[in-house]
Amino acid sequence: MAQKFVPEAAELCENSLKKFISLIGTVDKLLVISGAGISTESGIPDYRSKDVGLYARIAHKPIYFQDYMRSNRCRQRYWSRNFLAWPRFGQAAPNINHYALSKWEASDRFQWLITQNVDGLHLKAGSKMVTELHGSALQVKCTTCDYIESRQTYQDRLDYANPGFKEEHVAPGELAPDGDIILPLGTEKGFQIPECPSCGGLMKTDVTFFGENVNMDKVNFCYEKVNECDGILSLGTSLAVLSGFRFIHHANMKKKPIFIVNIGPTRADHMATMKLDYKISDVLKEM
């Protein structure tokens, strides 16, 4: 099942791999940026990969922050889908890539990890030197008072508020990298959304929605890490979204080496010191 979402990679060339590893070996302080491609081997699809990415398989339309905040029907649509997807998304396990990066923390040459993912798999693998740039789908936050609870706790509250819903809709659709699934229109009708137990406000998964600004404290912290590093390794991201690409661009402006492992083109290919179109695990297990 996990391999279903791993795109077809270029044939592994030992000489290219050795050169790549040798070049990275010259970097004293390495900053790593990870994207959805690092989690495809855990059975979570990415967005843009050819043939197997979410956008290649279905007409996925993400919910925008402004729509979520102003429309109860939009919130019903979001939470009914998220409710049915959670058992599968919440049980996703780290793969060899997450564990490899967790072990890198023991090295003085590893500086920090910035992940664009919201699946929490880096933390599940034991990583501590990590910034979840877009937040975490493993917790839910009040949009008014900042009350936070675990996603599983909120799942229990959703289940209590919607008896029989998951039994009636037993076949979840395609899973998205943010824990969303696709359901027929109208499925959400009547779905009840528990409010904040502290202030009665709207609850929302603690992730950055489309149309919502990334937390600037996180952004500034990540810029500091880029300034401090001697080079960047980008893993499993096309860098199509500005929130991650800006750090690569900043490093490039400072003439820092950039290394990329991604199956398919990225927005920063022309900036790369070297790029490999290989499966991430095939590279990391040799490093």
UniProtKB/Swiss-Prot annotation:
Catalytic activity: N(6)-acetyl-L-lysyl-[protein] + NAD(+) + H2O = 2''-O-acetyl-ADP-D-ribose + nicotinamide + L-lysyl-[protein]
Cofactor(s) essential for the protein: Zn(2+)
Record-annotated Deacetylase sirtuin-type domain positions: 10-287
EC top class named in words: transferase
Location(s) in or outside the cell: Mitochondrion matrix; Mitochondrion
CC cofactor note: Binds 1 zinc ion per subunit.
A Pfam family matched in the record: SIR2
GO biological process: innate immune response
GO cellular component: mitochondrial matrix; mitochondrion
Keyword Acyltransferase: no
Signal sequence region: none
EC number assigned by the record: 2.3.1.286
Keyword Mitochondrion: yes
Keywords, comma-separated and alphabetical: Metal-binding, Mitochondrion, NAD, Transferase, Zinc
Residues that hold NAD(+) according to the record: 35-55, 116-119, 236-238, 262-264, 280
GO MF annotations, alphabetized: histone deacetylase activity, NAD-dependent; NAD+ binding; zinc ion binding
Tissue spec: Ubiquitously expressed with high expression in the pharynx, body wall muscles and gonad.
Annotated catalytic residues: 134 (proton acceptor)
Assembly notes: Interacts with pyc-1, pcca-1 and mccc-1.
Entry's family note: Belongs to the sirtuin family. Class II subfamily.
Further remarks about this protein from its record: This protein may be expected to contain an N-terminal transit peptide but none has been predicted.
Protein name per the record: NAD-dependent protein deacylase sir-2.2
This protein's encoding gene: sir-2.2
